[in-house]
Structure formats: C-alpha cells, structure tokens
C-alpha cells in the first residue's frame, strides 16, 4: 500500500479542480469529489450512471467540520464516540447555512455522513478545506470495488486519479443509521 504524501497531494490537486478521484476506505473504494461543488458532484452522478434522486454519502475527518454543515445532537454524539471513525453512516439534519451541494442531498434537509477509518482517506480529508461526497466507485448496480485496479477497470480514463490504498479491509458498504427512525435504511458491515 502506497499512501505517501505525494499521492495524497496529487489526489487533492484533482479534487481542487472539481474532478472525481478514486479513494480507498475501509469498506470499499469511493468515487470522491468536493461535496461543496455542484460541478464536481454532478460528475459523480454522470460517471456512476446514478439517478440524481439517490443522495450521496459525505465523508468528514472532524466533528468541527461536520458541525459547519449538520445539526449534531446527543444521540449522534453517542454513536460518534462509539463507532467513529468506522463503517457507519449517520443521517443528520442539514443546517440551512451548509455549503453542501444541493445535488448531494437531492434538495432534502438531511445528509448522510461518515468518518472513514482508512489512513489514506483520513490523511486526504485532513488537508482539504471541504468534505468529500464519496459513494462507492462503481457504475450503479455493479459490484463495489475493493482495490485500485477494480476502480481503474470500472472507469478507465474517465476519472483523473485513483489513490492506492491496498485492499479495502471490509469489502461491504457501511451501515446506514437514521437517528430519528428505524429500521436501518441499509444493513452493512457493522
């Protein structure tokens, strides 16, 4: 696994220019883009052939950054302290002042968020000034990729860069948890 700083900076370079990149996480590789950029987020939908009414998960590295976009409550903090970082996606209320692209949420007032535990994803998120919209790096309805090679085979030259991060350890998408309803919208790795 080669997650040295030059590879991470190269990923940042493409993200800053509103491009999509492949990003390793502990669950599966993600197709990542600046969650604050309409232009970048729309590229995710096009590349994945994903319906725009299917909201995206946004990855954060810190609670402070998350609080700029979402309303945080006691129930969230309990789950955050127990399971984050890790393969759990939580759905929170979006703040009206949030910069998250309306295309990420399909104009809804909620946002699916998670804190990945993969060291490469964490290092990249820490040097960005924005969170990453990052659903699985596959064409919608196909198997989710667990290696850099899988992402490259899926998208070829349609994406600018894939950061090497070794095999995803879990190989299954994160569990999604709504904090104000049940059952879970999607069961996953936790």
What do these predicted ranges mean?
Residues 1-182, 186:
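Active-site-adjacent structural elements in enzyme catalytic cores
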Residues 188-190:
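N-terminal low-complexity segments that are often proline-rich with Ser/Thr-Pro
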């Amino acid at each position: 696994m080669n997650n040295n700083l030059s590879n991470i900076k190269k990923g940042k370079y493409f993200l800053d220019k509103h491009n999509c990149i492949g990003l390793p996480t502990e669950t599966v590789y993600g197709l990542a883009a600046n969650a604050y950029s309409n232009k970048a987020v729309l590229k995710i939908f096009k590349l994945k052939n994903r319906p725009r009414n299917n909201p995206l998960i946004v990855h954060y590295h810190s609670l402070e950054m998350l609080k700029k976009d979402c309303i945080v409550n006691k129930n969230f903090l309990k789950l955050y302290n127990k399971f984050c970082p890790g393969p759990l996606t939580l759905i929170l209320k979006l703040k009206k002042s949030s910069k998250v692209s309306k295309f990420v949420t399909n104009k809804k007032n909620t946002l699916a968020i998670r804190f990945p535990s993969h060291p490469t994803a964490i290092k990249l998120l820490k040097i960005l000034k924005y969170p990453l919209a990052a659903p699985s790096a596959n064409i919608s309805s196909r198997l989710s990729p667990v290696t850099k090679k899988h992402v490259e085979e899926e998208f070829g030259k349609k994406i600018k860069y894939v950061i090497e991060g070794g095999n995803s350890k879990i190989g299954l998408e994160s569990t999604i948890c709504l904090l104000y309803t049940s059952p879970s919208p999607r069961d996953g790795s936790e």
